[in-house]
A protein has these predicted regions:
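A short, mixed-charge helix-start or loop-turn motif at secondary-structure junctions
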Residues: 19-20, 61-65, 125-130
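Short, structured helix-loop boundary elements
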Residues: 2, 27, 31, 65, ...
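Alpha-helical structural segments
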Residues: 1-22, 28, 32-39, 50, ...
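Alpha-helical transmembrane segments and their helix-start/interface "positive-inside/aromatic belt" motifs
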Residues: 93-96, 100
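Amphipathic alpha-helical segments used for helix-helix packing
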Residues: 42-66, 115-123
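Short coil/turn helix-boundary motifs
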Residues: 22-26, 44, 58, 151
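C-terminal peripheral helix-coil segments that are non-catalytic and often amphipathic
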Residues: 36-39, 43, 73-92, 104-151
Length: 151
C-alpha cells in the first residue's frame, strides 16, 4: 500500500516536472499548472480516492515513507521559482508562501473529484458534465491567478 501511495505521488510530480513552465510567462505558467492539476485530478479519480483514504487513516501509512518529502520537494520548488519570477516581473504580489499556493491549488482541484457525489446530490447538478467541468476549471484557474496577482 505504501509503495502504491508513493508511486501515485511520484507519477503526478513527474508529469508536473515535464510541463516546461519555465518557458511560459509567469501568469501563463500558473494557469497551465492549475489547469494541469485540475485535469489530472479529474482524469485520475483513483489518485484522489487514495489520498482521501490515507487522510481518513490520518496519514498512518504515509508517515512510514522515507521518500514522500523528497517526492514532493520538486513541486514546491517549481511553484517557488514560478512565483518568484512573477514577483520579480511585477505580475504577482509579494509575501505569499509557495506551500500555501500549492495547498490552494490542491484544495480547489481536489474538491471537484472528492465531493462530486455529495455536492451534486445537494445542489441537484451533474458536477461531471462537460460544460460544468469546463466552467469549474476556468473558475479554479481564475481564483488562483487572482489570489497571486499583484494589485
Amino acid at each position: 500500500y505504501l509503495a502504491v501511495l508513493e508511486e501515485a505521488y511520484r507519477k503526478v510530480r513527474t508529469i508536473e516536472s515535464e510541463l516546461n513552465l519555465e518557458s511560459l510567462a509567469p501568469e501563463d505558467a500558473l494557469r497551465a499548472l492549475v489547469g494541469f492539476t485540475f485535469d489530472h485530478h479529474h482524469g485520475n479519480k483513483d489518485y484522489i480516492r487514495l489520498v482521501m483514504t490515507e487522510n481518513i487513516n490520518r496519514g498512518a501509512y504515509l508517515a512510514q515513507s522515507k521518500n514522500i518529502q523528497a517526492l514532493n520537494v520538486p513541486a514546491i520548488q517549481g511553484i517557488r521559482r514560478l512565483y518568484e519570477r512573477g514577483v520579480a516581473s511585477g505580475v504577482f504580489r509579494p509575501g505569499l508562501d509557495p506551500v500555501d499556493i500549492h495547498a490552494s491549488i490542491s484544495a480547489l482541484t481536489f474538491f471537484n473529484v472528492s465531493n462530486q457525489h455529495t455536492f451534486g446530490l445537494i445542489f441537484k447538478m451533474d458536477t461531471q458534465a462537460p460544460d460544468v467541468l469546463a466552467t469549474r476549471r476556468a473558475n479554479v484557474i481564475d481564483v488562483i491567478v487572482r489570489y497571486v496577482r499583484a494589485p
